Amino acid sequence: MSNNLAIQLREGTSKSHSMAENVSFVKSFLSGVIDTNSYKKMMSNLYFVYKAMEEEMEYHKENDLIKPIYFVELNRSESLALDLNFYYGDTWKDIIEPSEATRVYINRIKKISKEKPLLLIAHAYTRYLGDLSGGQILKKIAQRALNVPNSQGLAFYEFDKIDDEQAFKQKYKKALDTLPVTDKMISQIVAEANIAFNLNMRMFQELEMSYIRIFTKILMQFLINSKDKLRVMLNFS
């Protein structure tokens, strides 16, 4: 018997989903405007999030509520590790660290894993369904914006162990719909999914502020240089 969890998650998080997509950093990325440094930082933050989530999912993989939606072929942390090696080099693990917003996200995942692992379903849904839905589009955008050769540094968007991503997405939704959950549990999962979207939004907003600071610094330096050049020109006139 279906519990309609997939539909309830989609409908119950529609507002949060829309808010996350409308963060300026995300809109900029979707329009093909992103610099390599910001992209690298985004990937490193996602690495820490996926690593935490996938470790906790694996820990609970025999749990009756987690087992039906535990698919190792969805795991992204190893793919992200390949990308980070491309962008940062072999010593990437010594270079990257989670941002403040990312630490909050990780701590939330670890907290619910310990106290109520049922809620891990919400985080898996939020990340993996998004990856399966828009991965190839985002890959093309990133490839054009970053001008990377032969799709290098874009392993995050590739599901090598999944032949048909759309079919797998339907399989995942069906697995959600057959979980042995009560109405109360569904409400808790939907509420946690909204928290997950908010945590993602905070990470993107943090990157947005970092991007603004960098842009402002570049603009100020440009204005200073222009002023100096103008002064030199006036002295020679």
From Swiss-Prot:
EC number per UniProt: 1.14.14.18
Alphabetical list of CDD domains matching this protein: HemeO
InterPro entries found in the cross-reference section: Haem_Oase (IPR002051), Haem_Oase-like (IPR016053), Haem_Oase-like_multi-hlx (IPR016084), Haem_oxygenase_CS (IPR018207)
Keyword Transmembrane helix attributed: no
Coarse class of the protein's main subcellular location: plastid
This protein's UniProt keywords: Chloroplast, Heme, Iron, Metal-binding, Oxidoreductase, Photosynthesis, Plastid
Record-linked Gene3D superfamilies: Heme oxygenase-like
Catalytic activity field: heme b + 3 reduced [NADPH--hemoprotein reductase] + 3 O2 = biliverdin IXalpha + CO + Fe(2+) + 3 oxidized [NADPH--hemoprotein reductase] + 3 H2O + H(+)
Superkingdom, natural source: Eukaryota
Position of the signal peptide: none
Binding site for heme b: H17
Root EC class: oxidoreductase
Gene Ontology MF annotations: heme binding; heme oxygenase (decyclizing) activity; metal ion binding
A Pfam family: Heme_oxygenase
Function: Catalyzes the opening of the heme ring with the release of iron. Key enzyme in the synthesis of the chromophoric part of the photosynthetic antennae.
Annotated family: Belongs to the heme oxygenase family.
Protein name: Heme oxygenase
